[in-house]
Amino acid sequence: MQSDTVKKHCYSSSSVLFVFVLALGAPLPAAALAQSDSGIARWIAAPHRTPRNVARDPFRHPLETLTFFAVKENSTVVEILPGSAGYYMEILAPYLKERGRYIAANRDEAAAPRYLADHQKLLARLKGEPALYGKVMVTKFNADKHEIAAAGSADFVLTFRNLHNWIQRNEVDGALRVFHKALRPGGILGVVDHRGRNDMTQEAQMKSGYVRQDYAIAVIEKAGFKLAGVSEANANPKDTKDHPEGVWTLPPSYRLKDKDRSKFEAIGESDRFTLKFIKQF
């Protein structure tokens, strides 16, 4: 059930907020990319990355996204649920290895059985490539137990395409409390997720995997964060958001398998918002 605060943000946003979001929503300027940390670009281009992850770069825009969040090589970064695929782990863990810290907050052995195999794959991968992942810290992020980092120790908490799941399961408030506790004052929460339609309520598209951007902002600000920026780095105007199996119709999931595959391949991965929040003191 939506709170009055959330409803107000979703259905009666002021013109001031609208202009603010539009002003922040432009793609990252070329000048900003030119000033991005060359270390991030180097690890994005490094040969250790899996071909499957590299193939997703045109849709996930890692350089633009991490530059927008302003991650630096001496940062302490907690990534929520990197999983065994480790798309951002492949980039962030070696980038932060010498001067910063990368923390993988993942489901562990206490999680549901369906997640156990993935967690074991993650641990095996870390152990098998110590030159890249030898300093990765693995912490817990289960539905009922969160020990992601010491209180006030993280410069960044980053979460990619997880918010919709927590909203569906009524776990979002608990997750945001954990993030707020882990971040230092002024620390950054970075959120990327499938952007929902503005002509539908959040409830109406809940099971599709999409989240209204204004709804996401309202929920997160209610938890003690302040919106600091909006990026269109991960936008996809081809995404009509009316697919038979929701966001999972599109790549890389292709839930319909070969049915209309060329159509959904032409659309590409989902339209996504990229939001940056600051922890309030």
Predicted regions and their residues:
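S-adenosyl-L-methionine
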Residues: 116-145
